[in-house]
Design a protein with these regions (language model features):
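Charge-rich, low-complexity N-terminal segments
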Residues: 1-48, 54-119
């Protein structure tokens, strides 16, 4: 009988939760603002993790790219903080990616609401 969740999925879920906590509690850079960790994809060898984030107060691509640069610069600090937990022997190298799907979804939802209200 196969396991319901593989190791990479468990590690990805753990990283998503811990990174959300660390970004809220430990990172004090005002250039980031409020950030939401949407998803984490971990490579099969657990060496790399792609972290999909959105920013609550930044809708333009320029603002998001600046905040992404700050997050990618802080990736080493976050990786060190994650390594202090004894649950993982090695912590994947983190790479932050802007998740534009949430913003697109919000725009589509606004368009639908506007179309419905015009009828």
């Amino acid at each position: 009988m196969a396991r319901e969740f593989g190791r990479t999925e468990r590690v990805a879920d753990y990283l998503r939760q811990e990174l959300a906590r660390l970004l809220q509690m430990e990172v004090r850079d005002p250039r980031i603002g409020m950030v939401s960790v949407n998803e984490v994809e971990v490579s099969r060898d657990l060496a790399h993790a792609k972290v999909f984030v959105t920013f609550m107060e930044r809708d333009s691509e320029k603002d998001a790219s600046e905040a992404l640069a700050v997050l990618n610069h802080a990736a080493g600090f976050l990786r060190t903080e994650l390594s202090r937990d004894a649950r993982m022997r090695t912590v994947p190298k983190l790479r932050f990616v802007y998740d534009a799907g949430v913003v697109r979804g919000r725009k589509i939802s606004d368009l639908i609401e506007r179309a419905v209200s015009e009828d």
